[in-house]
Amino acid sequence: MRQLLCLLAIALAPSAVFAQPARPDWNEPFPAHQIIDNVYFVGTVLLGSFLITTPAGHVLINSDFESTVPVIRESVESLGFKFEDIAIILGSHAHGDHMQADALVKELTGARVMAMAEDVPALRRMRPGDKEHPIDRILEDGEQIMLGGTTLTAHL
């Protein structure tokens, strides 16, 4: 019986990762602020989202949950940037609380979604609102992303 319960818990765990936030404070705003140079915090009290600004558009790291997008948008705009200028969406790792809203942010901004090759299988199973999770570019360890004079290096 114990073994069956453990297997059941393991089998159901991924669905919890892709679900909407169970905690209302996950969407509680936190003051947007500059971290250093062109890197800004635009997340919530419990969810870390970051904006890297460039003259050619911006990079959003962690779109979080779909219900969090209005908070992120407000944070971006409170810093004087346009949400629509997001050109690239990245995620720290393939969990719903970091990348579930990629499709929505892409729809709102036209941004390209990029993900590590190792995250692709989990992202393909992530279907918020029964939408396919977009992946425009698959990144390998050490690969570089360049935008507006800023270079990011993907690391696993």
Label each region the model flagged.
Residues F41, L51, Q144-M146, T153:
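Residue-level detector of beta-strand face positions
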Residues V17-P21:
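Boundary at the C-terminal end of the N-terminal hydrophobic targeting segment
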Residues S67-P70, E77-L147:
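Active-site HxH/HxHxD metal-binding segment of metal-dependent hydrolases
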Residues L5-A16:
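Bacterial N-terminal signal peptides
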Residues D25-F83:
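Conserved beta-strand hairpin/beta-sheet module of binuclear metal-dependent hydrolase folds
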Residues E140-D141, T150, A154-L156:
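Ligand/cofactor pocket segment of small-molecule handling proteins
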